[in-house]
Amino acid sequence: MTSGAPPTISTEKSRSKQLRKSSKRTASTVEGTEAKQMRGDTENRSDGEMDDVSTSSEIRHGNGFIENFRSQTGNSSRTTATNERIKKKLVIKNFKANANQNDVAMGDTNIDSTDGSVGRDWAVLSDNVFAILEDRKTVTTLEGLFSKVRSVCDKNQSKVLYDRLVAIVVQFAKSLKESLNAVEQVPLAEDNCEQYLEKFGQIWQAYPVKINLIRNIFLHLDRIALGATDTEILPLWECFMQIFQKTFFPNIFKEFKATKLFNALYMAMQKIMQRYPVDSPLRSLVDMLQTVHVSEEFAKFLISQLREHYNNERIDKVPKMNCNDYMEYCEDQINRYSQLVKVNFDEPSALKDVQATVTNCLIQQAIPEILTHDFDDLIDSDNISDIGRMFNLCRQCVGGEDEVRTQFSKYLKKRGEKLIATCPDEDLVSELLAFKKKVDFIMTGSFKSANDPVKMRQCLSDAFESFVNKQVDRSAELISKHFHTLLHSSNKNVSDDTTLDQMVDEAIVLFRYLRGKDVFEAYYKRGLAKRLFLERSASVDAEKMVLCKLKTECGSAFTYKLEGMFKDMDASENYGRLFNQYLEHMNKEKANFTARVITPEYWPTYDTYEINIPKEMRDTLTDYQDFYRVQHGNRNVKWHHGLASAVISASFRPGCKKELIATMYQTVILLLFNKCETWTVAEIVEHTKILEIEVVKNVLALLGGRDKPKVLQRVEGGGSEKKEGTVENLKNEKFVVNSKFTEKRCRVRIAQVNIKTAVEETKEVKEEVNSDRQYKIDAAVVRIMKARKQLNHQTLMTELLQQLRFPVSTADIKKRLESLIEREYISRDPEEASSYNYVA
């Protein structure tokens, strides 16, 4: 069988995929062909010889090139029978370590002249090798050439045959290099780099195919004969690759230098990055660099070029671009270069190194400067994708996540302080909740991949705690009033218990940030008292649900008084049942009356005084007092008329009867109009003994207004319903029942008018809180000193600040210490003035 010459370079393009793989494998296709061609020749061989030949089907080249060397040690005697198996040993060496050695030694290239057949065999072999290298047809079959190689090796001429073959391949590689020199004379540029790569690609496309065919012909020499010698000789494939390396990349390991091929490859990659069409064997040439073991040198060159390029890009773009646009550009560059490397490089380390280099140059070196360019606008945009891109790119850099966290904290404080300073009271809590919801959305959507999520959440908590407590008393008051609105029966925004529970949880989060929780408690207690006394609570279960959440946050000591308020309400219901039994026992008419007996310790402080109660109401109150004395051993009750309410049956005119839900003061005032048609403020005060300010407040409520029931009207001005002048003018007017009352509902609730200003109410709460804080400071000092017996001032201050749950100044603590010294709970140490002793 005669083998045809390999196709020429021009026809190899149709087999580009096969040739690309030929640089990575040992051309199993060629070896398979060889096995078929040799099949006819094996019939005349011994079994031992067949075993040797059959080893040609083994795969020896891994991923495109040999990284192992072989050497043969031990007994290699050829005087035994031909079917005695030769012992072989494989010695592994680093090919690159040998790259700096001199070219393969040629040794003695004289074929033994005593055997004319050896010379004739070499002549045939060399002619056919030249034919393969020169793309000519071989004159001898591959089986015949294989037999001649075996014949020469059997005559102990293996080393000489090896050297002569290497010399031919060296000359062939030099001829290929000379064909490339014409192209290398032209200066390299982006517009001609593809031509250079195309020429180099053609050279590499042909080289491994030809030498692999030659290697298969000399397979016996490569696997058997050379392995039996005592010298360490490179396998043919490794030797041929080393020849290519030394020819086309001379001295590359002695001193790193960028070859023209490296520059051309980089230019082609940059053109691809700029979205220009590139027609060059880029992947094939990168594979070639791996095959001839210079890929690491190219990787160093590529990294240095990328570092220079992207450093210049960063310097140019950072001053001109905002944070979002710059991060979008960085992500695009990283993704596209990563894809380019994935397509053209097999080594995972190449992708990792390129990504790290681009990230370092574009982002690591730009932090924290780029984060100051419209960072707030990026967060304000609520674009989870853009914010997430910025965060994910920064967190890949050393200290990047910390910088984002710092900028995010500044943003939160800036926006939060602006809300505290500019929002009106009625909108502040809702704005804070909306801001918190937005930030939570960013945290879960954009920052979910944080390397340290605990620090990220702590950053959020610290920022909110910072600005919520900028005006701590105001924040505490408004948050408590927000709870009052949620739990009030007039709240129309709550459709079911689930919605209410969710809204309460959101408000609890704001409450958690408060430092002055005792201020919140004071306001919350007032709101709760109003809801309970006036029966305006949306649900007792909802009230207790909130109480449970507050207890979970702050402990039972915080909710002790609030829980006591509910205990009083439950006890009052029980008293109501017992009171009805008492009336029945005393043969008195059952009264439509409910009393709330409260423990002063639990409830807000209220001013109490006696007023003139109409007889029909006074008798019932007297009966309840008698009942309570019976129940509690002559203990008396004190009535808080300002907290009471009543239902009045009113007849404004024939056919117009209504039920009015009014406060106790409003009820007493309205009942006066059964005695006389007109009354002045002064007359009402005189007959009821109600404070003038309370009379004015309740008369205003009865006069009503827009969208409010007008139970009374002014006499002066023809019964004008218009409220004119000040409170002083109101005192000089007369009032009469509005006979034209037109409310459509049968039961009408009369609204309350609060004349007391917010400043006055705040002052009262502040005084109450300060008084309560004094007791808490005193108790904490005594508790600490009782346990420690003696402490210096600084240690005592430290332990106090750890135990107290509200903000307190050192001046306030010093005042309480002086008070305790005066009351002889503690004393100063006579030997150390800065220390205190506990007084038993």
From Swiss-Prot:
Component of cullin-based E3 ubiquitin-protein ligase complexes which mediate the ubiquitination and subsequent proteasomal degradation of target proteins. The functional specificity of the E3 ubiquitin-protein ligase complex depends on the variable substrate recognition component. In association with ddb-1 directs ubiquitination of cdt-1 during S phase and is required for restraining DNA rereplication. Probably is involved in ubiquitination of cki-1. GO terms for biological process: DNA damage response; proteasome-mediated ubiquitin-dependent protein catabolic process; protein ubiquitination. This is Cullin-4. Keywords: Isopeptide bond, Ubl conjugation, Ubl conjugation pathway. GO terms for molecular function: ubiquitin protein ligase binding. Part of an E3 ubiquitin-protein ligase complex including cul-4 and ddb-1. Residues 1-82 are annotated as: Disordered. Residues 33-48 have a biased composition (Basic and acidic residues). It holds the Pfam family Cullin. Neddylated. Deneddylated via its interaction with the COP9 signalosome (CSN) complex. GO terms for cellular component: Cul4-RING E3 ubiquitin ligase complex. The keyword Kinase does not apply. Residues 1-11, 69-82 have a biased composition (Polar residues). It comes from Caenorhabditis elegans. Belongs to the cullin family. Pathway: Protein modification; protein ubiquitination. Residues 772-831 form the Cullin neddylation domain. There is a cross-link at residue 786 (Glycyl lysine isopeptide (Lys-Gly) (interchain with G-Cter in NEDD8)). It comes from the Eukaryota.
